[in-house]
Amino acid sequence: MTAVDPHAARARHRPWPRRCPGIALDLGSARTRAWMPGHGLLFDVPTVTFGDGPLHPIRRGVIVDTPGTARMLDRLLGHRLPRLGRPLVILAAPVLGGMAFRTEARTAAEALRPQSVLTVPAARAVAEAAGTDLGRPLLVADIGAHVTDVVLLIDGTVADARRTAVGTGDIDRSAPPARITEAVIAMVSAILDDTPQTRGALRRGILLAGGGALRPDLTYRLTEQLQAPVRPVPAPHTAAVRGAAALLQSVHGHPSVATPASGDSPHPH
């Protein structure tokens, strides 16, 4: 018997506006989220697909089944879009997902018949959701279910980034998050060694997003061991998609806030 996700059920019965100006997406390894400006969160559901191919089309921040991802998006959104509407889609893309992630994500999003597909670095989207001053260097740690990223933003642009394939799904809920804490500290230290501006960003404090930010013990351990403020973003699990939606509203007037899915990305270290 197949379990029914309550969020998906609510999304199916939620009314949609007649016009569809745009949709923000966050394609995570564990959860997929969509947000429409002026309408709010459309759904927050498990990243799963059905039919041929893997059950989980995205694994540890990598799209391993593009057709499956497309089917998932069509199942969740396709039949709900206005027949004559072609949405502008913006994707919160992992900074170190590279060209491959953006290209595969854009291909999958074509299932929605978009007028255009744009991407924005997930860390930038998180900062937007938090309403953070981007005029100063900022460290963002995004702790997901299977991947953790630490990103240094300077003037709102990605200056350096690190990734490790570990997340909250790799540890027991009742166990201390030592593995994740050690990974974040190692990544912050590596960026600090390479980029001098990291020191100022660390004094300012780390912005914490993703499901890991919902664990107070993780915030406490990072604050204690880094000797720096660590601030969870409000509703951290939806921060990336909310920030992408905020940027979506200014794309028409200021297209530089998001880049085409074929654009360059920082090189992984």
Feature-to-residue mapping (PLM):
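Internal active-site segments that recognize and position negatively charged phosphoryl groups
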Residues: 139, 147-148
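Short, glycine/acidic-enriched loop or turn micro-motifs at the edges of active sites
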Residues: 29, 145-146
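Amphipathic beta-strand/beta-sheet edge segments enriched in Tyr/Trp
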Residues: 150-153
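Nucleotide/phosphate-binding catalytic cleft detector across ATP-hydrolyzing
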Residues: 1-140, 157-208, 212-269
